Amino acid sequence: MAVGISPGELRELTDDELTERLRESKEELFNLRFQMATGQLTNNRRLRTVRQEIARVYTVLRERELGLASGPDGKES
């Protein structure tokens, strides 16, 4: 999982790729929260980074849904 992916890079991905990235990020967030609860988490900042990445993916998907942005290659997804 890339750290700190930009919204521009996310906009270049297809809907399927965004959905897969969202699933991976949510799984990572779950694992980080589990590590935090058991006291094994060493990088607390990673929680915030993953949450922000999830929000960015949701934002790009919503922009496409509303027609504010198109998918990769200028096509509506």
From Swiss-Prot:
A Pfam entry, by short name: Ribosomal_L29
Q: Which InterPro entries match?
A: Ribosomal_protein_uL29, Ribosomal_uL29, Ribosomal_uL29_CS, Ribosomal_uL29_sf
What is one GO cellular-component annotation here? Answer: cytosolic large ribosomal subunit
Which Gene Ontology biological process is one annotated for this entry?
A: translation
Q: Which UniProt keywords apply?
A: Ribonucleoprotein, Ribosomal protein
Instruction: Name the domain of life.
Output: Bacteria
For this chain, one GO molecular function annotation is: structural constituent of ribosome
Asked if the Swiss-Prot or TrEMBL record annotates the protein with the keyword Ribonucleoprotein, the reply is yes
Q: Specify whether Ribonucleoprotein is a keyword of the entry.
A: yes
Q: Which family does it belong to?
A: Belongs to the universal ribosomal protein uL29 family.
- From the Swiss-Prot or TrEMBL record, give the protein name: Large ribosomal subunit protein uL29
The encoding gene is rpmC
